[in-house]
Amino acid sequence: MEYAVRAKGISKWFGERDARIEALRRLDLDIGMGELAMLVGPSGCGKTTLISVVAGLLDASEGDLEVLGEQPRSMSGKQQILFRRRNLGFVFQQFNLLPALTAAENVAVPLFVAGWKRKTAVQKAADLLAQLGMADRIQSLPSQLSGGQQQRVAMARALIHDPRLVVCDEPTSALDAHSGHKVMELLAEIAVRPDRAVIVVTHDSRVLEFADTIAHMEDGRITHLEAGARMARLAINQ
């Protein structure tokens, strides 16, 4: 089996050893390619810290981590940046949209960086926004968008370069049920591909039906894994 993420004995703490705060405690987790995994648990249990470590935005204090078959710790800083840019897409709760760019231009930023022609990049971005129900907002500035619309722009920007691993922190938190369903349908379409994987942190029970695996977290640890609805349906049909 090919893995998107293999984490073994991962710990993350903040502060000095005598007064440190442990966010992750010797955590083990495997996520396969072709899988949509969800992390659930109470606020402060370590979910966002875990995906930040996976995304390379934080270094683990202890343990071994493989992402898409690579060990980020063995890479130079420049190599890590290039690896993330080519292979990962992530959406966190701070969207960081560029205020002077339209919705479509914000989505197209990764393509601009990759050297795409502007017209082609913006058209691709507009098509993706249309999939997320925002065809009528592609020319809007971030200040003209609601929080939920900004969230969808951030999602589209994370997906525009077809990343192998998508990492999302509460991707439906600002969305109504219909818009949230559209976002999750798109993520599920990505995850069903054998060379792609998606990790979602969520408190939204409405989206659990899209999960292949649900990892329950508490106090910096994964307490148990649960087969999601999709895996349950596959088992029933076998």
Residues covered by each model-derived region:
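ABC-family P-loop ATPase nucleotide-binding domain
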Residues: 1-13, 224-238
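ABC family nucleotide-binding domain
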Residues: 2-218
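Intrinsically disordered, low-complexity glycine/proline-rich and charged
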Residues: 216, 223-224
